[in-house]
């Protein structure tokens, strides 16, 4: 914020490159939670930022919080392919490499990456049983859903 505040007076345009989108996973409201990512993006625009560039946003729809401003989200899967095509010294051990999708939401990205790399793909299946008692205790599992 200090850098933006110091440069906004003399800069014609301010672009912020944010490799990791701050609070990017907090994009859905449940209960009385705040939408921290949307609030942060709106605050940057109010400070005078013209465009925000990020990589692999958890949910690209977060750009809807700043519809009149620039928001570029670059997916790393395309960058992997460009890197592999450009740097011929990179060798992939296709017998020992496998792309894993941690859940259904990442499945399309995992399929794309596995196809580009020419390797197998796998997926985890998560099942939740909220009524289960473990060793006489009721565990609390904090999950990112």
Whereabouts are the PLM-identified features?
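PRPP-associated nucleotide enzymes
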Residues: 1-145
